[in-house]
Amino acid sequence: MKTKMFGLHEPICIKLLEQAIELKDYIVVRMILNQQENINTYKHFNMLRKAVLNHDHNLVNIFIDKNFNINIADSVGYTLLRYAVEVDDVNIAKILLDAGSIINKNDYRLLHSAITHENKKMIELLCLHGININVKDDKGYTALYYTICNNNYDMVCFLLEKNADISIVNKYSMLHFLSTSNKYHNVMAVLLDKGIDVNIINHVKAPIHVAVERNNIYGTMLLINRNADVNIKELHGGRTSLHLAIKERNYEAAFVLINNGANVDSFDDVGNTPIFIAASLQDVRFMKLLLDNGADINVRNVFGETPVNMVITGGSKEVTQYTVSYLISLKVDNIVLNDFCAYKQNMNLIHRINYGSPRLFMEYIGDIYEWHLPYSVLTDDKPINYSKIQSKVSHNESRFLPYKKRYNYNNTLIQ
């Protein structure tokens, strides 16, 4: 094939065109294009693609003036508009759109590429031409989700102004992701102000479960202040935020939860309350925190176990001594028991220590002998022993009070 004017074969003409483009000799470019019968070829597209990547606005306009089909796509399905967005060239993108470049409103690659550059003008331009701001990618994530991941406060606010939907979720909601770290607190506050569901459970957990597990104290408090349910349970397992805080040894999170109404005796699906976890961890801090705030140690799970089973199995002298002392204090103070059988089971468990390690047992209950309390307190729960204990305590107040002070019991909370 020859051109009209030059009488040259097409390959030679294409070569001359490429050289003229490289030299940015736009006069020659126009002359060659004028003489070519068909400029909507892959070779011409490739020339223009390079022009877009090199931000050559003049060449783009020349091709458009010569009626080049700007909606041609290459072998991977990319149009010139897609390349303009990829190189973040708003001017070329506008030229193409004004010239009739077609936008697939559900082309997530186009929008998400613009989001990568965080260019508000480009996103504004795409929205003006009908892009779906809430289109999901093949993983189910939207532009807003990726912007949140980048912790870009201004861009999040911008997308929300463009009606980005905060309720779209995949495996985790946007609020679940924000709950993973304190650094997202500003963006979290924006979404909460927009009314995102603070108690949404996606997959297994609610946002407060995630915040507590990650020891995100600020996020935990922010969620609570926006009416997050501190006692909401996992979809599978039935654990509450307090269960999780203790499991992860996040003391401050546990303290915040309890101070904001967390149920210290909430059961999971197998009947374990938070104190079961504290006992299994052999952590006296959590044992004391829970018991000081009214947790019941005389409780059994579906396997018939009490927290004391775990205390003794763990073998921590400090935790065992604290637990023994606490159980004895319940009897001394004549606390009303919710599950007398569980209490009896606990006392029998402790009494067995005497058979396995008498010396250790004597260390645990040495203070009890100092009170001159009857030994039967460990094994016999007849009412007559209550009167004996109360009588002994009243005659040995000077010894009893220092003991209580040593373990810092707060029995008004226990009741």
From Swiss-Prot:
Protein name: Putative ankyrin repeat protein FPV034
Keyword Repeat: yes
Organism: Fowlpox virus (strain NVSL)
PROSITE patterns with a match to the protein in the record: ANK_REP_REGION, ANK_REPEAT
Gene3D superfamilies: Ankyrin repeat-containing domain
ANK repeat copies, ranges: 12-41, 43-72, 76-105, 107-135, 139-168, 170-200, 203-232, 237-266, 270-299, 303-332
Keywords recorded for this protein, A-Z: ANK repeat, Repeat
Name of the gene this protein is made from: ANK2
PANTHER family tied to this protein: ANKYRIN REPEAT AND PROTEIN KINASE DOMAIN-CONTAINING PROTEIN (PTHR24198), ANKYRIN REPEAT-CONTAINING PROTEIN-RELATED (PTHR24198:SF165)
